[in-house]
Amino acid sequence: MLDVNFFDQLQIGLATADDIRTWSHGEVKKPETINYRTLKPERDGLFCEKIFGPTRDWECYCGKYKRVRFKGIICERCGVEVTRSKVRRERMGHIELAAPVTHIWYFKGVPSRLGYLLDLAPKDLEKVIYFAAYMITAVDEDARHRDLSSLEGKVGLERERLEKRRDQSIDDRAKKLEEDLAALEAEGAKADQRRKVKDGAEREMKQLRDRAQREIDRLDEVWNTFKSLKVQDLMGDEMLYREMKNWFGKYFEGHMGATAIQKRLESFDIEAEVELLRDTIANGKGQRKVRALKRLKVVDAFRKTGNKPQGMVLDAVPVIPPDLRPMVQLDGGRFATSDLNDLYRRVINRNNRLKRLLDLGAPEIIVNNEKRMLQEAVDSLFDNGRRGRPVTGPGNRPLKSLSDMLKGKQGRFRQNLLGKRVDYSGRSVIVSGPQLKLHQCGLPKQMALELFKPFVMKRLVDLSHAQNIKSAKRMVERARPVVWDVLEEVITEHPVLLNRAPTLHRLGIQAFEPQLIEGKAIQIHPLVCSAFNADFDGDQMAVHLPLSAEAQAEARILMLSTNNILKPSDGRPVTMPTQDMIIGLFFLTTDRDGQPGDGRAFASPAEAIMAFDRGEISLQSKVRIRFTDIVPPLELGADWEQGQAVSLETTLGRALFNETLPADYPYVNYEVGKKALGAIVNDLAERYTKVEVAASLDALKDTGFHWATRSGVTVSIDDVTTPGDKADILSGYEAQAAKVQKQFERGLVTDEERRQELIEIWTQASNEVGKAMEANFDRANPIYMMVDSGASGNMNQIRQVAAMRGLVANPKGEIIPRPIKSNFREGLTVLEYFIATHGARKGLADTALRTADSGYLTRRLVDVSQDVIIREDDCGTERGLPKRIGERREDGTVVKAENAETAAYARTSAVDVAHPETGEVLVRAGEDLGDVKIGELISAGVEEVKVRSVLTCDAKTGTCAKCYGRSLATGKLVDIGEAVGIIAAQSIGEPGTQLTMRTFHTGGVASADDITQGLPRVVELFEARSPKGRSPISEAAGRVTIEESDKARKVLITPDDGSEVQEYPVSKRSRLLVGDGDHIEVGQMLTVGTPDPQDVLRILGVRRAQEHLVDEVQAVYRSQGVSIHDKHIEIIVRQMLRRITVIESGDTNLLPSDLVDRVRFEEENRRVVSEGGKPASGRPVLMGITKASLATESWLSAASFQETTRVLTDAAIHGRSDSLRGLKENVIIGKLIPAGTGLERYRNIRVEPTEEARAAAYSVTGYDSYDYEFGNGTGQAVALDDFDFGSYQN
């Protein structure tokens, strides 16, 4: 077999019949598969051992040679080579066809490649191939020209002969008529009898005349056709063709079926055709030029690659190895077989029948029919259903052809090459493991034993518990007591990977250190649930075992949960305490009035704890405590020195809470709810090492659970209190509503106005009742505590239970103007319930659809961005994008802009940023902008910073580390090899499910405001489609005039530069943003709506189009409260704008209207200019992500994405080479991917443990240092150096 690491390119091309024969190990002559009695393959059949190899290892068919010692011998009796049976997965055969057939991909695809090459319409091509018309394949021009006059004479003579014969026979008939009439007269017949005879005779003479005329016309037609006959003419009239063949057979050749195409391709002069087409393109116009351009692409491809066009017509069909189309026996003695075997059998049967007919010399019509059937059989083998009705198997199911084997989710690419099932894995239900450390997971003993079986067996032999591996295996299978001790030893320090499907982002797979547990469920640390999006209502997770030392090192250093605290989409922590933990910590840090021991003072926290234990104070009593070893809160810390004692007005609960935080963290002296906790964790992640953060998180988790239990928070129906004055509030609003209704009935307001007013009235009513309810709650009310702390639920939900349900929407998304006045505590009336469920069900249906749509969007995003990898440190560009970090208030102070978090944070500054007043440089070019730096810049009054961006990066392939900036997942500058494209796609796709589907309507009538929102809007932007409710934008600066007529409305712009007036038709219903006589600038929107990104690109240029797309996508995500960093969206937008359409090709090798990569375009131009030639001109193209993925340089990647057959057809004709730069291509052929540790520069290096690596194991005591060479995985656990973990021990 080939070693994948020893080739750099994979090329695809057209296989000729000779290629097919050289691949083959023999010809399949019979349609038989296996003998039904012996169950052994039939000789020369589809499973023949002589062709494909033995079915049993080292054993020939007849049994003469058995055993490995005969390796390589070919048995003289049965002709089978003695070898391994797995060669039946790789040896091919072939079928020699009795007549050539065309390859359906090349003639039936759109556009038809054969049609383009030969300049034939696909309809005509089909007529020829399926024996409905003859095609002239050769004309002897010289002989025809030479003999034309003599032939004309011959034809003239024949015409005269026909005319003479006609005249003769008419004369004869006329004479006979005279004789008949004379005889009748003599007999004295009546006049009408004579008339009858005369009429009959005249009829006969007319027939004679007509028949003769037809023969003469046919002769003229034959002659005229022959005179103008040229190669590739089609003749659908068989009689005409036969006559012509009879008369002038030696001057031309004509054929039917694939033979005609084959002959035509053999004589086809590619060079001459290319010249001709180039000439047409240079001088032609309109349709001719367009068609010539399209044809040139195909013809030129054959010229450049040296592919033989004859490859599109096959004389032999390859037969794929039998183990790839197996036949297996079922329980009942019946057989299940792959569809391909049926399709191959049809081809072989028809082929053999055709051979027999040809040997018998059957009539042409029968042979042609058989040839047509053979063509159809081969078509359905290659691509069933592409032409005509598909061949069906039992139960009318279309058979799966070779093309179907590659296509779609179940095809070869996506099912077996991009996603394989792996060994050393298991799955089970998950349960919570609150006693675990952040980097641990609980693994059921049985599962662990099965996963670590080989390790345990080896260790048993090493420790002399077993003599050999076999007895060790027996011990493991019988689960002897010693086995469990050995297992315990083997799994120490050996991380496992846990994965929860769907894996929407990279945090869906993380590494943990396994702890053996009883039972059958995997235990998960509560804090990592949000990363996996897991809950414990029956979710399952898969466990995978990294085997080699390298894999373990990667799992421990890169994937351990303690090293994945930050979310890659916005760089904020993802391991946040939730639910119970928040309630516990909130209960702990809250203070209440009227508690026992209020106002007491204590000399130390220990003393306060003693008082608490004796019941003298509660956790929430307001007391004063003296601390000696803390950092005071920031507001007190101005004149504080290290080690100085501080006395604080606080509570015992807060003192306990602060013990969970690092010793040098400023004392937290306020109530900690979800928001405050988020800020604290965020701060920890920014300022402390991974070890300290993990330790603090674990402490927060333990404290949270502990006090949540002690707090006794419960939910009872009595905690839900409806405000007493609800009825009074509602009666006031009822009166208002009745008034509006009355006005409507009198005709004072329209239906639409009434709706809007009612909606306003009832919204106000809901708000007021809600406020009354909130005021009614006691702070110690458990339900109020849950909402207030942010642990679970929100006020809106409580409002529905305790106040009133309010207004609801119907399935169309319109608000129903009748409110639901009851709440769930009181219960709804039947009508109210009906109204409420109506819209709610739509919501559920929406969610199901949204999941699928969102997954498909992620797939397209990954595909378009997969080859964006950090390839170098710095591309050296000085360009960048300005990003807002501050907003100036009216009083002149600058505050942080709301989007600074996702715009400038974690980027690299492109220029030096100076203080606006003092001129001192605050940030140097190339410096990282973190929270602290941004804070400094804002306090200095800087509003905007120019930052490096992937949109302005000059790297040849991928992008550079400086332009990307900080990796949001680690908080440091991104590493070379990081697959930032995939991370971007995941960050955008993962929250996709949260985006709503619907278009929101305000009123019943659809208006221009119904702009698409949510997921469909994101898809619309990334696919670069023209948006719904598109608004035109002005192409020039000038004055506006508005013209109104009955049916239409036009906006006219008179440009300032005096060029011609531009007009924009706009619909009467759209709302204008400009008025008559206004002066507008280039790119200004004319109506309410969204501009088309293509217009923005055309009018305002690339940079503005990029900004427009990024801002619009962000607008959708922000509206749903999802935070994604701009840089992720920028990566996708960059991929959408990577290509350029060539307008004038100049002296380059590019063709006009070609789509080329920006880098290639610039390189080609540089080359031409350096040689003194004329460069090409082009314009940037905005491609949707699907199109951009299919337009990738890599054919493997494109084929595994969508439209597999089309991509492969095209790639084969162009002889495409895949240089294996992206990720998918390398996964498909089984190489290491060129990203992360798979980069060239990271291979063959030694591993030295760093702080980062040790950080993972803050629970592990010291270890001996252990070096190993990279590349020869020992399978031993990766040990770490001695490391002092302070007091944080297991």
Curated annotation (Swiss-Prot):
User: What residue ranges are annotated as transmembrane?
Assistant: none
Q: Which GO terms describe its biological process?
A: DNA-templated transcription
Among the Pfam families in the record, one is RNA_pol_Rpb1_2
Enzyme Commission number(s) from the entry? 2.7.7.6
Q: Cellular component per GO?
A: DNA-directed RNA polymerase complex
List cofactor names only.
Mg(2+); Zn(2+)
Reaction(s) catalysed by this chain's protein: RNA(n) + a ribonucleoside 5'-triphosphate = RNA(n+1) + diphosphate
Q: Where does Zn(2+) 2 bind?
A: 875, 953, 960, 963
What's one GO MF term for it?
Answer: magnesium ion binding
Q: Which InterPro entries match?
A: DNA-dir_RpoC_beta_prime (IPR045867), DNA-dir_RpoC_beta_prime_bact (IPR012754), RNA_pol_asu (IPR000722), RNA_pol_N (IPR006592), RNA_pol_Rpb1_1 (IPR007080), RNA_pol_Rpb1_3 (IPR007066), RNA_pol_Rpb1_3_sf (IPR042102), RNA_pol_Rpb1_4 (IPR007083)
Chain positions recorded as Zn(2+) 1 binding sites: 60, 62, 75, 78
Q: Which SMART domains match?
A: RPOLA_N
Q: Which domain of life is it from?
A: Bacteria
Q: How does it assemble?
A: The RNAP catalytic core consists of 2 alpha, 1 beta, 1 beta' and 1 omega subunit. When a sigma factor is associated with the core the holoenzyme is formed, which can initiate transcription.
Q: Which family does it belong to?
A: Belongs to the RNA polymerase beta' chain family.
For this protein, the record's PANTHER family field holds:
DNA-DIRECTED RNA POLYMERASE, DNA-DIRECTED RNA POLYMERASE SUBUNIT BETA
Give the NCBIfam families listed for this entry: PRK14906.1, rpoC_TIGR
User: What is the protein name for this chain?
Assistant: DNA-directed RNA polymerase subunit beta'
The gene is: rpoC
